[in-house]
Amino acid sequence: MLSQGEILRNPSRTRLQRPPKSRSERKGWWYRVTIFLTCLIPNFMLRCFGMTTPEVQHAWREKVALCICIFFCWIILGFTTYGMNTIICKGSNQYVASRLKRDAFDGNTVIANGGIYYTDDEYAFGENHTYAFEKKSGACKLAFGRQLPSGDEDIDDLERINDIYWDWGDIMSKGMIVVGNKVYDPSYCTEPLFEEFNRKYAGTEGKPDFDTDEWRCYEDMFYAGKVATKTPGCLLADTMFWITTISIFGLIITKFLLGFFYSWYAKRRPKPSPKITPCILLVTCYSEGKDGIKNTLDSLCKQDYGYDYKLIVVICDGNITGSGNSMSTPDIVLGLSDVDRRAEPKGYISLTHGTKRYNRAKVHAGYYHVREEKKSRRYRCWPCFGRQADSSEVENYKTRILVINKCGNPSETFKAGNRGKRDSQVILMSFFSKLIYGDRMTELDFEIYQKMKFLMPHIEPEDFECILMVDADTIVKPDALSIMVNVFETDQKVIGMCGETMILNKFESWVTMIQVFEYYISHHLSKAFESVFGGVTCLPGCFCMYRIKIVTNQQGQLLSGPSKSRASVPRFSSMKSILSSSLEKSLCLPILANPAIINAYSVLEVKTLHQKNLLHLGEDRYLTTLLLKTFYRRKLVFIPAAKCETYVPGEFSVLLSQRRRWINSTIHNLFELVQVNNLCGAFCFSMQLVVVMELFGTLVLPAAIIFTFVMIAVSILIEPAWVPLIMLVGIFGLPAVLILITTMEIQYVFWCLVYILSIPIWNFVLPTYAFWHFDNFSWGDTRKVDGEGKEDEEGEFDHTKIRIRELEEFLSEANK
């Protein structure tokens, strides 16, 4: 992506620059790697398959290059799992008595005289039979004047296979003695001279104290083989095996323990929030239906938070009519709200190319009402002749609302105004940045400023400190906003957070059922573990909250809530008055409104496959990545007490499309985080190592599930591999234990079993599909609209249509 210097030089919406002169682009190392890996496929072949433009062709080449790199990762995993022992270790050809398999030989075998031989007779397999064969030793005759007792079989008549080796388990159990690297079996020794030596060193390493002839006699008569030792290859294989095993299992155990600790810690009831920190409740709409939008706005309107300190902002991303809807999304939102519809379209600079870079939006200000009927307790009434009747109470909720409808420029015909969710978010992010830094504004910025002042005259627009972002199909629990704001007020290091997303349609289909446990462990295991270090790598866009800015005094104390040290400063004085106050000097640190964040997030030239996966498919996750990279000393956390509900895909094709976007954006964002050296921890005990392991684990998921099934089959049919099996039980068992402990609900055992049965889908089908569609940047079946497939022609951007002025200039013009 962009360097820090390029980010700061990146033109924001406050400046208009001349189109840059054409120049040859610098080709980086990845471009050269891509061309090298796909050099056997010429461009004319790609044109035959419909890939006509250079951008599409290079995106396809990047996809193939990435798939080749992923395949290499699979080979590395397979080699470390199976190939290392087979190739490196077994090349030593050591015949260890305890590891011999009868089926590995063409006939009967016998172990004797330090070797293994083929024989026609039957001998106990794996035992030492040296005593059965005749042995003559000149050293024995010199030492004792006779030969020691031995068998009468002639070993010279047998075919020798190889030397025999004994491991220490056999040596100790059979009472053998080791001297040097040689193993001796004194079990059939009857010579009194050797009796004390045999008794003293049985099963251990001996230290002989005999003369030369006596010891040579002992060697000739009782030699049984050599000590089984590991070759350098075996040592390397074992070292790699235990390093990976300890690392993976250590990460699993650590995640479990820290996830449990964080769950317990987060359950501590926080102090009640005064609920006076000004908050924006942002809802981004695209093609959602009326019911989904209404449920979301109702839930935000009913938030248990001060009426004067919250403002709902709905941004409709173009004149879009969702599939199955009778009205466009802007008409649905306006129909649900009590707003002034007499709004003029105002221009701004959008995140796209050509004529579409000039976009317009209408800003409607008003109120959103919810009338809810609640049943109270039953009572007996006289007209009911003693029967019980229900009494009902009507509760009315009212919240200020600002509707921003991106309507497009006059030349647009299809999907007028549609510029994407990232463009909608940057509208507000850049608006607050311009207020804080005093930068020039567009007409749309000033329109938003005026409507905010009209709706909330007691608050300056720059006084908003937090922004809650939700999708238009999310239902937020009534206490979620106050819980999240309270975290901001009590911990100034927290700059972003997410809550728990729960599934509403659990039993709609098998597709929804397999997602229940996956959603739960992604929050209470992964995000809880990351929260301990303050580095949640993904704050989901459907339900998250960010600081717009942090205001502190000179001692670093927050000024965003009631504080004794701030008694002399009015609560809702404007940002400029706070900064210029002679009573107490304050410091303002922009977070979401920081130019480093906005400029990197609003990159216009998105050319590479990596950039497109970051900014077109995973913009919410990339915003989290930018915050981690920029504010690495602050915290992004998961708050389990703040909850929301949503509907998940009920059809497999929709799930496939959704997870394609999520998996691909995850890979590219993790690659960005791998390059951040300032994450929490150091070396082997750092979040950077965890990110590396998660990235590699994501890439090898399909291969890992295949190897898992192979391991299970081998364990059942041949011999159990206990260490991998224990690790497998830990991977699937510990999350279930964690969830049972944290929820105390037995139903999650059922959801865990459903999830385990669907592991091939999660670990093979979805990742494999996502990898092969690296170059697909569409939203697929996740968001369908009527008339999909049409596109307006792209012309040249006319910057003269955009009016950019200082706020004071706009105000003076408006007051004339």
Swiss-Prot record:
It comes from Encephalitozoon cuniculi (strain GB-M1) (Microsporidian parasite). Belongs to the chitin synthase family. Class IV subfamily. It is found in: Cell membrane. GO terms for biological process: cell wall organization; chitin biosynthetic process; sporulation resulting in formation of a cellular spore. GO terms for molecular function: chitin synthase activity. InterPro entries: Chitin_synth, Nucleotide-diphossugar_trans. Residues 1-21 are annotated as: Disordered. This is Chitin synthase 1. Glycans are attached at N319, N664. It holds the Pfam family Chitin_synth_2. Its main location: membrane. Its EC number is 2.4.1.16. CDD domains: Chitin_synth_C (cd04190). It catalyses: [(1->4)-N-acetyl-beta-D-glucosaminyl](n) + UDP-N-acetyl-alpha-D-glucosamine = [(1->4)-N-acetyl-beta-D-glucosaminyl](n+1) + UDP + H(+). Polymerizes chitin, a structural polymer of the cell wall and septum, by transferring the sugar moiety of UDP-GlcNAc to the non-reducing end of the growing chitin polymer. It is a multi-pass membrane protein. GO terms for cellular component: cell septum; plasma membrane. The gene is CHS1. The chain crosses the membrane at residues 33-53, 64-84, 241-261, 698-718, 721-741, 746-766. Gene3D superfamilies: Spore Coat Polysaccharide Biosynthesis Protein SpsA, Chain A. It comes from the Eukaryota. Keywords: Cell membrane, Cell wall biogenesis/degradation, Glycoprotein, Glycosyltransferase, Membrane, Sporulation, Transferase, Transmembrane, Transmembrane helix. Residues 54-63, 262-697, 742-745 are extracellular. Residues 1-32, 85-240, 719-720, 767-816 are cytoplasmic.
